Amino acid sequence: MKQAEKRHFCEPALACALLKATPDKLIGDLETFGFLFEALVERDLKIYAESFGANLYHYQDYNNKEIDAVVELKDGKWCAFEIKLGANQIDKAATELVALRNDIEKNGGIAPSVLCVICGFSNAAYVRPDGVFVVPITALKN
């Protein structure tokens, strides 16, 4: 695993203001919208995690496999989150989370306790047959 800092927006709305991003502009530029959505979710996860003594990190290994957000609990257990704007990205994100968990276990590491895809456009939270949770951003609560 690599160690390096990842910068997070404290308030993604600041980037929107600087970019003069309107809803129409963001819908027309889904790549930027996705980056801003990821920053928004990371901000919220950090706030929720810190409220119960956990920490938020990013994961990337030397094969450039990554996890958008890692929440490490006080007891050392950790949860892996992929953050995706569109529901069409859920299957790929879940498959990558499962593969990364399997690689970590195969190499003798401590696997995440929870795998979760947080999605911007999903109607309900559910658990996939592979055990990956899918949670809409609107379901995140402290």
Indicate where each model-derived feature is located.
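Short beta-strand/turn micro-motifs composed of small residues
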Residues: 60, 117-119
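Arginine/glycine-rich "motif VI" loop of SF2 helicases in the C-terminal RecA-like domain
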Residues: 48-51, 98-111
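Domain-level recognition of nuclease-like catalytic cores that cleave nucleotide substrates
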Residues: 120-142
